[in-house]
């Protein structure tokens, strides 16, 4: 309780509702920064800020989020940038621009057919979760539910990969909060995943035709 997240003002309505209401009820404050100027994120940052959050191509504004600029600010303060890349799989790669964690709603472009609901979290493996222990206490303090494991320290030792965010999400939050995919939904989503690169290419071609038509 008392922690905060600085999030973009350009977000999907369901996410805004989660941030303004549900998280607030759990004692987490979400502050909203206009991404038109990345420095707005820094202005809202204090010692209790745990993460920055944005959408690569936000619904419904479609104003491209300044991933690199905000990620650079976050690195300066020991704050990870989490990006929802639902609207731009394949064509946008937030991890290459400095994001620490990427999320997708699998229901949209990745699955492509709207028959299943699901999501994924991708830990980029590049963020230093132990550099600022006070900033990231969940990754630097012993977890009594796992015999005192310190996620930021122990996960890299055990796995050889710097993915404590993903591992903790899997073994703690999934355990306690649920939200697992059924095997059948996972199967359906995998069918869509096989063609996502081809479909995104066609989506872009179709969008370009619409733009050219409107320009004329």
PLM features: residue spans?
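Conserved PLP-enzyme active-site core in the AAT-like
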Residues: 1-215
């Amino acid at each position: 309780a008392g922690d905060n997240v600085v999030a973009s003002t350009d977000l999907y309505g369901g996410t805004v509702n989660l941030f303004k209401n549900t998280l607030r009820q759990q004692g987490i404050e979400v502050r909203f920064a206009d991404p038109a100027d990345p420095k707005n994120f820094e202005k809202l940052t204090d010692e209790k800020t745990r993460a920055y959050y944005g959408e690569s191509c936000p619904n419904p504004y479609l104003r491209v989020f300044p991933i690199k600029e905000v990620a650079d600010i976050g690195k300066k303060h020991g704050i990870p940038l989490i990006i929802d890349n639902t609207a731009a799989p394949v064509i946008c790669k937030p991890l290459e621009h400095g994001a620490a964690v990427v999320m997708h709603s699998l229901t949209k472009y990745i699955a492509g057919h709207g028959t299943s609901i699901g999501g994924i979290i991708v830990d980029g493996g590049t963020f230093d979760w132990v550099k600022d222990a006070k900033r990231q206490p969940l990754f630097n303090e012993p977890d009594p539910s796992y015999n005192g494991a310190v996620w930021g320290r122990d996960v890299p030792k055990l796995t050889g990969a710097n993915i404590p965010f993903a591992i903790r999400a899997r073994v703690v939050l999934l355990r306690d909060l649920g939200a697992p995919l059924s095997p059948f939904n996972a199967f359906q989503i995998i069918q869509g995943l096989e063609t996502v690169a081809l479909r995104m290419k066609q989506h872009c071609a179709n969008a370009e035709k619409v733009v050219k038509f409107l320009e004329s």
